[in-house]
């Protein structure tokens, strides 16, 4: 089973790179997580000339992946002021039906958000299927809205910090997060009775003094933000999921259900759907 999952994650990465790595890119964002290891490997083995491409990491792990693959890293702060990333590849902890994501399990959420918002398009490669609604770290028992400083494990004493030396606070919520389409006059998604809509919650948390970034990636996609001539596209345009049965499921923004696009091995189209 574990081998099947790893094979599917690798296949998802290969499909994502094959379908979304642009011709002659200038800058490409590289996120973190187990699936992104395979994304970098797929880029390295693609045969594409990337000698003039700058790869922008979201954290220390990403930078090491880039360097170890023989690719050229460039720090986010070193980007020219007007430069956009042609594409950014990253993982996610949870993804809902509208491709809103929870990220930050690897403690890189601030840099991940900067990279996603600077990219023309954000492609998510994940190790699990889409869920109906974000559960806000639903592996924990809901405890209201009490924030908890994430504690280190055996390898690290004290609270977890980001690569920029900021504290990470996990805030479980009592109910799964609503989509905008779930909101009604009786359930506005503004926190009343513990029900939050994704974008309203992200905005409310961001307005708390001292909060630098929120691990909710929602709102417009990169193309939507560019079309509106605004900065801030952070929702992926597509998510590739490596499934336990060895298939790759693809979900695009605004798509009603995922398509099974590949099975590994070999990488061949199995079934697609049009909505």
Positions of PLM-derived features:
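Glycine-rich beta-strand-to-loop/alpha-helix junction loops that act as flexible
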Residues: 27-35, 39, 58
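Short active-site oxyanion
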Residues: 25-28, 48-55, 100, 237
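Active-site histidine-anchored catalytic micro-motif
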Residues: 41, 45-53, 59-64, 68-69
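Flexible, charged surface loops at secondary-structure boundaries
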Residues: 20-24, 49, 82-83, 117-118
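Conserved phosphate- and dinucleotide-binding cores of soluble alpha/beta proteins
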Residues: 3-7, 11, 61-275
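An N-terminal, well-structured beta->alpha segment
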Residues: 1-25
């Amino acid at each position: 089973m574990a081998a099947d999952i790893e094979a599917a994650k690798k296949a998802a990465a290969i499909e994502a790179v094959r379908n979304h790595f642009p011709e002659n890119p200038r800058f490409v964002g590289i996120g973190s997580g187990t699936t992104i290891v395979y994304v970098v490997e797929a880029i390295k083995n693609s045969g594409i000339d990337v000698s003039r491409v700058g790869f922008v990491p979201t954290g220390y792990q990403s930078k090491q992946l880039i360097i170890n693959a023989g690719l050229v890293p460039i720090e986010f702060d070193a980007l020219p002021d007007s430069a956009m990333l042609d594409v950014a590849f990253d993982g996610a902890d949870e993804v809902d039906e509208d491709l809103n994501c929870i990220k930050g399990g690897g403690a890189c959420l601030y840099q991940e958000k900067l990279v996603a918002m600077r990219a023309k398009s954000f492609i998510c490669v994940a190790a699990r299927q889409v869920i109906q609604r974000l559960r806000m770290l639903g592996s924990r028992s809901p405890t209201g809205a009490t924030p908890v400083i994430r504690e280190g494990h055996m390898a690290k004493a004290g609270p977890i910090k980001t690569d920029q030396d900021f504290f990470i606070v996990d805030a479980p919520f009592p109910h799964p997060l609503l989509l905008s389409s779930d909101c009604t006059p009786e359930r506005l998604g503004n926190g009343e009775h513990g029900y939050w809509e994704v974008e309203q919650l992200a905005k409310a948390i961001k307005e708390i003094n001292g909060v630098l970034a929120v691990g909710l990636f929602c709102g417009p996609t990169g193309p939507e933000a560019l079309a509106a001539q605004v900065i801030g596209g952070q929702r992926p345009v597509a998510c590739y999921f490596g499934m336990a049965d060895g298939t790759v499921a693809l979900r695009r923004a605004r798509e009603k259900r995922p398509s099974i696009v590949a099975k590994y091995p070999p990488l061949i189209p199995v079934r697609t759907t049009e909505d």
